[in-house]
Amino acid sequence: MSFPASTHVYIAKIIGKKGEGDKILDLLSKVNEHVLKSEPFTKTYYFARDAKNPDYIFGLELYDSKEVLENSHKTSNPFLAFANYLTSTHAPLAEPLQLLNFKVVDGHLDKDNLGPDAKDYVLYTEYTGDSATLKQQLTVNPKADTSLIIHSLDDPSLYAVVTRYSKSGIEPGPAEISGATSVSQQVIYSGVGFLNRP
């Protein structure tokens, strides 16, 4: 699958206090409804829970460009309601919000257009090391339903890979890259969002 050079990837790490995951996802569901109706420039809007912490929400978002993310998506009323809740006096976050900017290196989002499912095995792995080595050694997995390699726009030494197997029982581990460190996170689709626009 090819992606336009302007495609902007946004990884969101939203770590809520105990019991906040449901409220955060409820607000994101309302944003998702708006995205589907009014944002053709939003190509992926996918939210999952951390497998070990249901109040840790992981987001994978793809936009036509960073400009439409900042000037259109983030200015919509449903998104502003969500953002205002995160910064409200209610203080729902256990840790500061992390928003990471990436570009696509290679890969595919939903090989057979099956759509996401809570039974999928999904692994998000960040690799830190020599940029040239990571670019050369990280490869797309043609057997995976999702295999997306992305490169940080903020830190040249940071790459990440999203791998998903659709209800197959396969549980892949991170790639072994010489001289690089890796941190992996298993996530479970929350029922909110999409990989490819329906």
UniProtKB/Swiss-Prot annotation:
One of its GO terms (molecular function) is oxidoreductase activity. SUPFAM superfamilies: Dimeric alpha+beta barrel. It comes from the Eukaryota. Pfam families: ABM. This is Uncharacterized protein C21B10.08c. GO terms for cellular component: cytosol; nucleus. Residues 8-102 form the ABM domain. InterPro entries: ABM_dom, Dimeric_a/b-barrel.
